């Protein structure tokens, strides 16, 4: 996935964009019935970071056993990605621009005060 190709997964991608990007993840040409190696699958390489050990073991077994479609794997990835990103997206939506400006103003005043004291110390030592 590359930002240059606009196929990266953004933290704030809405459901439609996320689904489109997941569907575009390249896979090999093996049929549903054929066993697949999860370590060679782009979809698995992403989803393995979003699931627990038990889920990972079950998914790996499905890959090796055959019968796993890439459509299913991509839907599973989409489901896990959505669940992972939703809390972040909800929190982002809650934060208003005014809150951010207020926090930046408060902290910039604190930082300026500290920096001014440090600069004065340095001038006195020189």
Protein language model regions, located:
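Conserved nucleotide- and phosphate/pyrophosphate-binding catalytic cores
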Residues: 1-126
């Amino acid at each position: 996935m590359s930002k240059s190709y606009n196929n990266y997964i953004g933290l704030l991608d809405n459901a439609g964009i996320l689904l489109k990007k997941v569907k575009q993840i390249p896979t090999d040409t093996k049929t549903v019935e054929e066993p697949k190696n999860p370590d060679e699958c782009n979809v698995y390489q992403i989803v393995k970071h979003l699931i627990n050990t038990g889920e990972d073991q079950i998914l790996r077994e499905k890959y090796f056993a055959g019968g796993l479609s890439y459509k299913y794997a991509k839907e599973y990835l989409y489901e896990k990605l959505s669940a992972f990103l939703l809390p972040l997206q909800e929190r982002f939506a809650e934060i208003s621009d005014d809150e951010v400006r207020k926090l930046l103003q408060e902290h910039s005043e604190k930082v300026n005060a500290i920096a001014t004291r440090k600069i004065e110390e340095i001038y006195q030592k020189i």
